[in-house]
């Protein structure tokens, strides 16, 4: 059995889990998420927790059980607490402004960059150089943060660009004559 799949997922108060065939639905205070479970993974709900097991013992099936357990754990955490990712803009004139479902970015280009936020994701700008991306789907929050960072990734000489708040940018020294 996968070492990840051995650990059960604890269901906090206020989180409901429903099975319909291979469709798993997790409902909580912040919303609902759904997942198509692979047919080789067996899920058992007992005493406020979910247990995962592979239907047969081959390597790929055991790996799929561990992956499913990790995805369901992220879903449970998302509908109960939510996820957030913080980005920082470093550079002269770099600004961000959230307007509803659009994030307006000034990143040193000759034009402003307007990023349309997908459904289920919100963005806040506590200051002009900080962006806070929030949502219940961990994969989608990370994907949106990566797409925003890709507009202007941090460069190694001056460190200018869009970076994650916890990211360490390796700096290079300029070439000398």
UniProtKB/Swiss-Prot annotation:
Superkingdom of source: Bacteria
PROSITE patterns: RIBOSOMAL_L6_1
Keyword Transferase: no
Pfam family, one: Ribosomal_L6
Function: This protein binds to the 23S rRNA, and is important in its secondary structure. It is located near the subunit interface in the base of the L7/L12 stalk, and near the tRNA binding site of the peptidyltransferase center.
Matches recorded under NCBIfam families: L6_bact (TIGR03654)
Name of protein: Large ribosomal subunit protein uL6
């Amino acid at each position: 059995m996968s070492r990840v799949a051995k650990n059960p997922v604890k269901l906090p108060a206020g989180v409901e889990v429903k099975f319909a065939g291979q469709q798993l639905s997790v409902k909580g205070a912040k919303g609902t998420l759904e997942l198509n479970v692979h047919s080789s993974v067996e899920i058992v709900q007992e005493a406020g927790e979910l247990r995962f097991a592979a239907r047969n013992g081959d390597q790929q099936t055991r790996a799929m059980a561990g992956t499913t357990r990790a995805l369901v754990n992220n879903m449970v955490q998302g509908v109960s607490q939510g996820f957030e990712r913080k980005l920082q803009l470093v550079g002269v004139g770099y600004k961000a402004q959230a307007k509803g479902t659009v994030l307006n970015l000034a990143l040193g280009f000759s034009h402003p960059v307007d990023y349309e936020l997908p459904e289920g994701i919100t963005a806040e700008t506590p200051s002009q150089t900080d962006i806070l991306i929030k949502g219940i789907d961990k994969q989608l929050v990370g994907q949106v943060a990566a797409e925003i960072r890709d507009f202007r990734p941090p460069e190694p000489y001056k460190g200018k660009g869009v970076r994650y708040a916890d990211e360490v940018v390796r700096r290079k020294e300029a070439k000398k004559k």
